[in-house]
Amino acid sequence: MTENIHKHRILILDFGSQYTQLVARRVRELGVYCELWAWDVTEAQIRDFNPSGIILSGGPESTTEENSPRAPQYVFEAGVPVFGVCYGMQTMAMQLGGHVEASNEREFGYAQVEVVNDSALVRGIEDALTADGKPLLDVWMSHGDKVTAIPSDFVTVASTESCPFAIMANEEKRFYGVQFHPEVTHTRQGMHMLERFVRDICQCEALWTPAKIIDDAVARIREQVGDDKVILGLSGGVDSSVTAMLLHRAIGKNLTCVFVDNGLLRLNEAEQVLDMFGDHFGLNIVHVPAEDRFLSALAGENDPEAKRKIIGRVFVEVFDEEALKLEDVKWLAQGTIYPDVIESAASATGKAHVIKSHHNVGGLPKEMKMGLVEPLKELFKDEVRKIGLELGLPYDMLYRHPFPGPGLGVRVLGEVKKEYCDLLRRADAIFIEELRKADLYDKVSQAFTVFLPVRSVGVMGDGRKYDWVVSLRAVETIDFMTAHWAHLPYDFLGRVSNRIINEVNGISRVVYDISGKPPATIEWE
C-alpha cells in the first residue's frame, strides 16, 4: 500500500493574478500537494477537497468595484488557516469588516516593509534591521488599492510609509494577509513565509516528493488499467517521455509507444529517441517513418496556422492507422500536465488564464473506444522533469530548450521543403553545440535557428554564391510570456556564423534576431 501523498493539501483560489501558478509551484516545492481552483467555488467543493489551508491569490481587479470577485464566505468558516496575497488580502479585509480604498499612488516593484508586531508568519524572518532593532523585509509590491482599515480582530504586523497594513494577522483564527507577492524571487524571504504558513501554521507534512509521486502514479496506473494494453504517442519531448517511463514501470510490455518520424525533428533526433527508449530502456516502440507524407501534405502551404493544422491532422491520421493495427488496446495514454488541465477548466468556464495550451494526440477513430490514462495531469513541468530524473532519463534531454509541437514546420518560414529542413537541422545543431561548448546553453531560456526563404549573395574563394539565410534566436525569460533577446558575446556569434557558412553548403548568410517579446513572439511563426 503506497502512502497517501495527497493527505495534506492546500487549496489555492485564483483571482486572476499572473503569478497564481507560481504560488502553486512554490507550495509543491515545499513538498505539499495543492490544487488551483477558480475563486467562485462552492462550499460543497471546498468541503469535499478538505484542505489543510487555503491561499487567496492576487488578481487584476479592484476590490472597490461593485462586482469584483470575492472569496466564498465558507473560506473563513472552514476552521483552517487562510493566507491572502495582495488582492487576496484586500478581499479578506473587506469581507471580515475592514476597509479598502483605491490609492492615488500605485505601488509597483521593490519595497521594504518594517515588522512592527510579532506574528507566526514572519517570526525570526528578516532581511535587515532598523536602527532600533526591528526586522525589515525586502518585498515585491504590485497593487493600486490598499487596505485602509483592518478587521477589528486583526493586528498590523508590518507596514511601509505608503502602505500602513503591509501584513495583517488574526493569530487565533490563523488568518494572514500580505500586500506583496511572497511567491516571486524579488521577495527575498517569500519562500520562508510560504513555508511558515504551509508547513508550520497548516501543519502539512512534506509528502509530495519525486520518489513518492512515482510510487503513487505507478499504483494508480496499475489500478486503472489492470492487465489491459495501452498505446502512447511518443515524441521524444519531456511530457511523453516521462509518461512512457512511468507506464513502462507500471505495466511493462503492455505499453506500446508509437513514434511518428514526421521529418520535422532536430538533427539525429529520431535515432536518439529509438536508441534511448528502445535499445537502452527496452520499451516496445513502433517506429513510423512518415516524412514524405508530412512534406507532401505541407507542399505549397505558406500560412503558419494552416501549417500547424496540417501537421496536427496528419499526425492524428498516422497515429490512428497505427492504433488500428494493434490488437486489444483498451487505453490511450497522454502526457497531459497540470497547466493543460487548468487551461481546459478555464476554457470551459470562460475564465481567462494566461497559459497557452499544448495539444496532445487529439481525436481517435470513432470505432476505437478507449479509456484515457494521464499520469502527469497533477504535475507542473518542473515536477515532470524531476520525476524524469528519478526515473533515469538523462538531464540533457529533460532540461533541453522548448521545441514546438510542429517542429521545424514553424521554423522554416513559408513553404516547408525537405531541402530547407535539412539545411536548418545542420545549422541549428552547430548553434546548440557551440552554446554548450561555451557554457551558454543553460544561461539562455531558449535558443534555435530559423530558416528564411530568401537568397543572399555571398563570396566563397574566388567565386560568388547565391544561397539561403538563417537567423539565430536566443532569449532570456522567466515565464515565456515576456522575453529579452540574449546578449550573446560577439566573438561567440562570429564563431557560430563562420561554422554554419563554412560547414553547411547552401547557407550564405547568418543574422541574429534582437527582438524582444513583446512586440515580437519568441518563435517566428
UniProtKB/Swiss-Prot annotation:
Catalytic activity: XMP + L-glutamine + ATP + H2O = GMP + L-glutamate + AMP + diphosphate + 2 H(+)
Keywords: ATP-binding, Glutamine amidotransferase, GMP biosynthesis, Ligase, Nucleotide-binding, Purine biosynthesis
Domain GMPS ATP-PPase: residue ranges: 208-400
GO cellular component: cytosol
Enzyme kind, highest EC tier: ligase
Highest taxon in the source lineage: Bacteria
Domain (Glutamine amidotransferase type-1) ranges: 9-207
UniProt-listed Enzyme Commission number(s): 6.3.5.2
Single annotated GO MF: ATP binding
PROSITE patterns: GATASE_TYPE_1, GMPS_ATP_PPASE
Binding site for ATP: S235, G236, G237, V238, D239, S240, S241
SUPFAM superfamilies: Adenine nucleotide alpha hydrolases-like (SSF52402), Class I glutamine amidotransferase-like (SSF52317), GMP synthetase C-terminal dimerisation domain (SSF54810)
InterPro entries to which the protein is assigned, alphabetical: Class_I_gatase-like, GATASE, GMP_synth_C, GMP_synth_GATase, GMP_synthase, GMPS_ATP_PPase_dom, NAD/GMP_synthase, Rossmann-like_a/b/a_fold
Catalytic site positions: C86, H181, E183
Pathway: Purine metabolism; GMP biosynthesis; GMP from XMP (L-Gln route): step 1/1
Record note on quaternary structure: Homodimer.
Its biological purpose: Catalyzes the synthesis of GMP from XMP.
Protein name, per record: GMP synthase [glutamine-hydrolyzing]
Source species of the chain: Shigella boydii serotype 4 (strain Sb227)
